[in-house]
């Protein structure tokens, strides 16, 4: 029996599971994915470099990227936004860089770095 089921084994699903585990380490969490592999897009995102987030730090600017849900996203983005995502990787020794167009990538230009940090079962009980 699980306390939390996360539907979708992509980057957002794994990140949500990790954040839930950080908030409550005793949670039993399962990630359900209907595809053949989990985190498949992470390995190819940004031409194999893994676009981690976008450097929109102003919440209004950030919500403009989501025209169908910008009002609904203001609340969640007040709780967890771009800076939090970047801090997650940097606190785990994944230095990031911001490109001219605002995309944020690992300085290593390697998606396996991001992939590894999203799938550390010894740290996160997922």
Segments the model singles out, each with a brief description of its role:
Residues 17, 21:
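Gly/Ala-rich phosphate-binding loop of Rossmann-like dinucleotide-binding domains
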Residues 49-98:
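Glycine-rich active-site loop/strand segments that organize a redox cofactor
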Residues 117-126:
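Single conserved hydrophobic/aromatic residue that forms the stacking wall/gate
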Residues 13:
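N-terminal Rossmann-fold NAD(P) dinucleotide-binding loop
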Residues 1-10:
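Beta1/beta-strand and adjacent pyrophosphate-binding region of the FAD-binding site
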Residues 22-42:
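Glycine-rich FAD pyrophosphate-binding loop
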Residues 74-81, 102-115:
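Short beta-strand to alpha-helix junction loop
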Residues 36-38, 43-44, 52, 56-59:
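An anion/pyrophosphate-binding glycine-rich loop and adjacent beta-alpha core
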């Amino acid at each position: 029996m699980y306390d939390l089921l996360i539907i979708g084994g992509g980057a957002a699903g794994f990140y949500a599971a990790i954040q839930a585990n950080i908030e409550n380490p005793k949670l039993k969490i399962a990630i359900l994915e209907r595809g053949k592999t989990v985190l498949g897009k992470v390995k190819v995102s940004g031409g194999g470099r893994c676009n981690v987030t976008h450097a929109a730090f102003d919440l209004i600017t950030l919500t403009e990227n989501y025209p169908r849900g910008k009002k609904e996203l203001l609340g969640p983005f007040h709780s967890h936004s771009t800076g939090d995502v970047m801090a997650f990787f940097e606190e785990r020794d994944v230095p990031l860089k911001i490109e001219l167009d605002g995309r944020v990538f690992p300085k290593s230009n390697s998606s396996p770095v991001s992939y590894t940090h999203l799938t550390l079962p010894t740290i996160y009980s997922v």
